[in-house]
């Protein structure tokens, strides 16, 4: 019997949530393909969606526009569904340079990539959950529309082991090698196996916490046990176990041999075309490269850049969509598109950028034309494959509104009673000095400020100016990677600094209840960064604070400003009426400062340094004498460096914060 979703929350739906949940469920049960939930910042959109998932009990994919937001949603869904499978599926590249050719300088750039092993394990865990159970929520980025191994081949390659099964050791080892597991009797890690006599230990590729022990006796599986790979301690026996391939791209030998024949046929045709056009260098290049790949595939079962032959390996025809995560989602699955006004255009844009780069590679003989089918889904293919969909946004785009027939489900009232920020329009002439005085007021009462500018140059100059005048300020720009960006946002919330300056980086979905002021410089300059949607999203960053306020600096009120102010005031009035009717006093959000960085770091479970373990509060050291306090600082610093050497950056960061506080305490009492 399939397990049901069980929602854990100390809250019950309130405000506009019960009505939104009822309408969404009604629409899904009536077979509506598209619905739009217009939920303002802080209205509990994720909680509403979690209730819908739990009530309908259907496997669900949640699409987010970027890794940061996907990580935040993953953390929230894990809290709502601790007993169910909540999975995380984003690009596993920490760094990715696709192969490319620049004809103007005759430069070929080899593919170069760095894979995050922990995220690869989470991707494998996500597809395994979708294949094995129905109580699954997969939080994914737009990586979900990129090619993945064919689910049919993936299922065929699995190794099923059952207690009492007749199979010899050699057969198991051969099958493990076909699944791309490697034997390593010294270092036992994910995706490896080791052999000790009649005992085979397998560390599944999708696991980071446990491994499988297979005990054989006279060509029979005598016992299957789950054990802790770190301590070796047996946890429990299982009657059967399925070993999944180490990678999504694993392919049976017979399919590889068939693919090789098809590649040879295409190569012969391509050579004729190139020779007919007198492209001798390109003909020599494609022949040499393809024959080398064929030789590797014959010997090893794979080659570098094998994804460029994915059309043959998956058995799909020219122009057909590649297999993606959507192929793993059951037909009655549910799709939630979060921050849909950003996510939907992203899906549409991925295919075109990929296509132009590949066409150059094909034209100059670096790849066969079939490589063009190793691509993300086209938008129309996404539309055809997507199951019943709920678009979630505070500012839905034209596409979502059209698809849902203009019928939008409003979730404007917040259960906490929090009102939308007050909006003031102030002149541009004095914007910098006015902003500085506002920052000082907020810093004095331990609140944070977000400032958005129009250009990178202005952001840099403003940051420098604010620093010179004593403000604790940081600048967030496009060169900062995902992990560092998360650290900056975390440090802002912790009070390491008071002001964050950005351009277009602080809009959708990020929870920062400590931010009480959003300042939008040059708000009267019409354009993408100052459109109605951008303004509403930016203003919304202050909507989680009791004293939320937005200052728009402009010498005139543009049409976009007028619409954004009008919509914010409409929402504010609706919330105010709700509060008065029910006697609700607005309450600020007290959201704990979690750390989503662990998504990119391996688990430290079992090492006595679990991620859940909180660093001791500095209040515990208030009574220490200066000498004892100095000793404690040295101890914590030593621990911090040990964590950093072990790549346990989350614990190191927590200790760094604690050492910083203790140093201030030490200075105060010295």
UniProtKB/Swiss-Prot annotation:
A motif (Beta-hairpin) lies at residues 92-115. ATP binds at residues 39-46. It is found in: Cytoplasm. Keywords: ATP-binding, Cytoplasm, DNA damage, DNA excision, DNA repair, Excision nuclease, Helicase, Hydrolase, Nucleotide-binding, SOS response. InterPro entries: Helicase/UvrB_N, Helicase_ATP-bd, Helicase_C-like, P-loop_NTPase, UVR_dom, UVR_dom_sf, UvrB, UvrB_inter. SMART domains: DEXDc (SM00487), HELICc (SM00490). Signal peptide: none annotated. GO terms for molecular function: ATP binding; ATP hydrolysis activity; DNA binding; excinuclease ABC activity; helicase activity. Residues 26-183 form the Helicase ATP-binding domain. Residues 600-620 are annotated as: Disordered. Coiled coil: none annotated. Residues 630-665 form the UVR domain. It holds the Pfam family UvrB. Transmembrane segments: none annotated. GO terms for cellular component: cytoplasm; excinuclease repair complex. Residues 431-597 form the Helicase C-terminal domain. GO terms for biological process: nucleotide-excision repair; SOS response. The beta-hairpin motif is involved in DNA binding. The UvrABC repair system catalyzes the recognition and processing of DNA lesions. A damage recognition complex composed of 2 UvrA and 2 UvrB subunits scans DNA for abnormalities. Upon binding of the UvrA(2)B(2) complex to a putative damaged site, the DNA wraps around one UvrB monomer. DNA wrap is dependent on ATP binding by UvrB and probably causes local melting of the DNA helix, facilitating insertion of UvrB beta-hairpin between the DNA strands. Then UvrB probes one DNA strand for the presence of a lesion. NCBIfam families: PRK05298.1, uvrb. Belongs to the UvrB family. Forms a heterotetramer with UvrA during the search for lesions. Interacts with UvrC in an incision complex. HAMAP family: UvrB. This is UvrABC system protein B. It comes from Yersinia enterocolitica serotype O:8 / biotype 1B (strain NCTC 13174 / 8081).
């Amino acid at each position: 019997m399939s397990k049901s979703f069980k929602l854990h929350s100390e809250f019950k739906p309130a405000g506009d949530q019960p009505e939104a949940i009822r309408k969404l469920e009604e629409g899904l049960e009536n077979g509506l393909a598209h619905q739009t939930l217009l939920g303002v910042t802080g209205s509990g959109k994720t909680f509403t969606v979690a209730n819908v998932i739990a009530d309908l009990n259907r496997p669900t994919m949640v699409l987010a526009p970027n890794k940061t937001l996907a990580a935040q949603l993953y953390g929230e869904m894990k809290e709502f569904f601790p007993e169910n499978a909540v999975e995380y599926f984003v690009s596993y590249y920490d760094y990715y340079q696709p192969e490319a050719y620049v004809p103007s300088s005759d430069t070929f750039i080899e593919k170069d990539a760095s894979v995050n092993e922990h995220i690869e394990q989470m991707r494998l865990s996500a597809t395994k959950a979708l294949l094995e159970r129905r109580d699954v929520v997969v939080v994914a980025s737009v990586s979900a529309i990129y090619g993945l191994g064919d689910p049919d081949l993936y299922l065929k390659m699995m190794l099923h082991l059952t207690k009492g099964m007749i199979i010899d050791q050699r057969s198991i080892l051969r099958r493990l090698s076909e699944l791309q597991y490697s034997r390593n009797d010294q270092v036992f890690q994910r995706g490896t196996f080791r052999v000790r006599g009649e005992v085979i230990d397998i560390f599944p590729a999708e696991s980071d916490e446990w491994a499988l022990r297979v005990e054989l006796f006279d060509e029979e599986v005598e016992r299957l046990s789950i054990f802790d790979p770190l301590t070796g301690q047996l946890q429990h026996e299982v009657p059967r176990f399925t070993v999944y391939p180490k990678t999504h791209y694993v392919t049976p030998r017979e399919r590889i041999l068939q693919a090789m024949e098809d590649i040879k046929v295409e190569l012969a045709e391509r050579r004729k075309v190139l020779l007919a056009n007198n492209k001798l260098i390109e003909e020599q290049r494609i022949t040499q490269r393809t024959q080398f790949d064929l030789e590797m595939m014959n010997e090893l079962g794979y080659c570098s850049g094998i994804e460029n032959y994915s059309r043959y390996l998956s058995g799909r025809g020219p122009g057909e969509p590649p297999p993606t995560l959507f192929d793993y989602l059951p037909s009655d699955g549910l799709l939630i598109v979060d921050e849909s006004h950003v996510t939907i255009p992203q899906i549409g844009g991925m295919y075109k950028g990929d296509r132009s780069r590949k066409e150059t590679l094909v034209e100059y003989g670096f790849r066969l034309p079939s490589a063009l089918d190793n691509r993300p889904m086209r938008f129309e293919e996404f539309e055809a494959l997507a199951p019943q969909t709920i678009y979630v946004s505070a500012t839905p785009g034209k596409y979502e509104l059209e698809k849902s027939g203009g019928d939008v489900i409003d979730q404007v009232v917040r259960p906490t009673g929090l009102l939308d920020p007050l909006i003031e329009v102030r002149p541009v002439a004095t914007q910098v000095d006015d902003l500085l005085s506002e920052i000082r007021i907020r810093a004095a009462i331990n609140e944070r400020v977000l400032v958005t500018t129009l250009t990178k140059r202005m952001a840099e100059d403003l940051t420098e100016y604010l620093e010179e005048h004593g403000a604790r300020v940081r600048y967030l720009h496009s060169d900062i990677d995902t992990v560092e960006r998360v650290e900056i946002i975390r440090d802002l919330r912790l009070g390491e600094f008071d002001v964050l300056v950005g351009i277009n980086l602080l809009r959708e979905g990020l929870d920062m209840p400590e931010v009480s002021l959003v300042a939008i410089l040059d708000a009267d300059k019409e354009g993408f960064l100052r459109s109605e949607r951008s303004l509403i999203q930016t203003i919304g960053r202050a909507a989680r604070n009791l004293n939320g306020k937005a200052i728009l600096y402009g010498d005139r009120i543009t049409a976009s400003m007028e619409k954004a102010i009008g919509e914010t005031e409409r929402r504010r009035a609706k919330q105010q009426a709700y509060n008065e009717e029910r006697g609700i006093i607005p309450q600020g959000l007290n959201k704990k400062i979690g750390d989503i960085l662990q998504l990119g770091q391996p688990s430290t479970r079992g090492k006595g340094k679990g991620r859940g373990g909180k660093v001791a509060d500095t209040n515990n050291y208030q009574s220490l004498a200066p000498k004892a306090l100095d000793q404690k600082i040295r101890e914590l610093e030593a621990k911090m460096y040990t964590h950093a050497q072990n790549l346990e950056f989350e614990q190191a960061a927590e200790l760094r914060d604690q050492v910083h506080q203790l140093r201030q305490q030490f200075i105060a009492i010295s």
